[in-house]
Swiss-Prot record:
This is Actin-100. There are at least 13 actin genes in potato. It catalyses: ATP + H2O = ADP + phosphate + H(+). The keyword Nucleotide-binding applies. PANTHER family: ACTIN. One of its GO terms (cellular component) is actin cytoskeleton. Its EC number is 3.6.4.-. Belongs to the actin family. SMART domains: ACTIN (SM00268). The gene is AC100. It comes from Solanum tuberosum. It comes from the Eukaryota. Keywords: ATP-binding, Cytoplasm, Cytoskeleton, Hydrolase, Nucleotide-binding.
Length: 357
């Protein structure tokens, strides 16, 4: 979260709400009934953590409201009734969800104006393009979204329920097989950190496995909070390999390369060349070293042999959805696009389908 026109978000925190497991254990602590974001994270030992966004789609509105409240009042320290708000949504977000978001913004937070934009479209804007295909992979879900002249093509959007959280799970499982125990929500965060710091994508998986067997070149060590040191080798690339081979964790889905290809093939034959030449990676789960080269190699193998293929992995892609939003909301041409409170009062939540597409 942050302000339009800024080049980076002011606040970045996990979408988590934590509630005390046992009430009133801590005497004189003035215990809150709920903690949000980093505070929930740091007190996770005594809390039960909930994720109100599942697979990119809001599933628990009470907790989501807490997160928004926390964003306005504690993180950005603004009064929401004084600022227009740009929200983002997952591709193919159900209609009822868009309406609910709109309703909460106008009725609970009293915003003067708001707009809902599709995440992948914002990432594409942030890369300086209006046509291309975005592979957006975050914590809960991945999507491939073909976009032509600024508009997402809904019939060709594909969703893959495989993303950062699954890779963390996979690494937890691999480490458990090796005799380490990571089970609680607190320990999962340690494994996530390990994944972010050490994992990478192999250009050739089989060959990398051979290398890992015969040498210690891929081994790296990681210090746990209690001082114990773990050494991980092949695990470093076995975990993100799941993005290309979901069958490794028993999923029947196509990998991210094949899903991207399938998405392009659902588009009109005349625009495919523009899509192949503008494949943009976005989201935290595309931050692994080596992912762009591997993606390029895999798509080249699937595409027609004469096709020029370009995979773009902007360094700021972890936040490119936010950056695209900052750009969009600052444009003078965008100012007529906002849904105003007056329009909402007149038409109700369904106005969002007429004004945001």
């Amino acid at each position: 979260a942050g302000f339009a026109g800024d080049d980076a978000p002011r606040a970045v925190f996990p979408s988590i709400v934590g509630r005390p497991r046992h009430t009133g254990v801590m005497v004189g602590m003035g215990q809150k009934d709920a903690y949000v974001g980093d505070e929930a994270q740091s007190k996770r030992g005594i809390l039960t953590l909930k994720y109100p966004i599942e697979h990119g789609i809001v599933s628990n509105w009470d907790d989501m409201e807490k997160i928004w409240h926390h964003t306005f009042y504690n993180e950005l320290r603004v009064s929401p009734d004084e600022h227009p708000v740009l929200l983002t949504e997952a591709p193919l977000n159900p209609k009822a969800n868009r309406e609910k978001m709109t309703q909460i913004m106008f009725e609970t937070f009293n915003v003067p104006a708001m707009y809902v934009a599709i995440q992948a479209v914002l990432s594409l804007y942030a890369s300086g393009r209006t046509t291309g295909i975005v592979l957006d992979s975050g914590d809960g879900v991945s999507h491939t979204v073909p976009i032509y002249e600024g508009y997402a093509l809904p019939h060709a959007i594909l969703r893959l329920d495989l993303a950062g959280r699954d890779l963390t799970d996979c690494l937890m499982k691999i480490l458990t097989e090796r005799g380490y125990s990571f089970t609680t929500s607190a320990e999962r965060e340690i494994v996530r950190d390990m994944k972010e710091k050490l994992a990478y994508v192999a250009l050739d998986y089989e060959q990398e496995l051979e290398t890992a067997k015969s040498s210690s070149a891929v081994e790296k060590s990681y210090e746990l909070p209690d001082g114990q040191v773990i050494t991980i080798g092949a695990e470093r690339f076995r975990c993100p390999e799941v993005l290309f081979q979901p069958s490794l964790v028993g999923m029947e889905a196509a990998g991210i390369h094949e899903t991207t290809y399938n998405s392009i093939m659902k588009c009109d034959v005349d625009i495919r060349k523009d899509l192949y030449g503008n494949i943009v990676l976005s989201g935290g789960t595309t931050m692994f070293p080596g992912i762009a080269d591997r993606m390029s190699k895999e798509i080249t193998a699937l595409a027609p042999s004469s096709m020029k293929i370009k995979v773009v992995a902007p360094p700021e892609r972890k936040y490119s959805v936010w950056i695209g939003g900052s750009i969009l909301a600052s444009l003078s041409t965008f100012q007529q696009m906002w849904i105003t409170k007056g329009e909402y009062d007149e038409s109700g939540p369904s106005i969002v389908h007429r004004k945001c597409f």
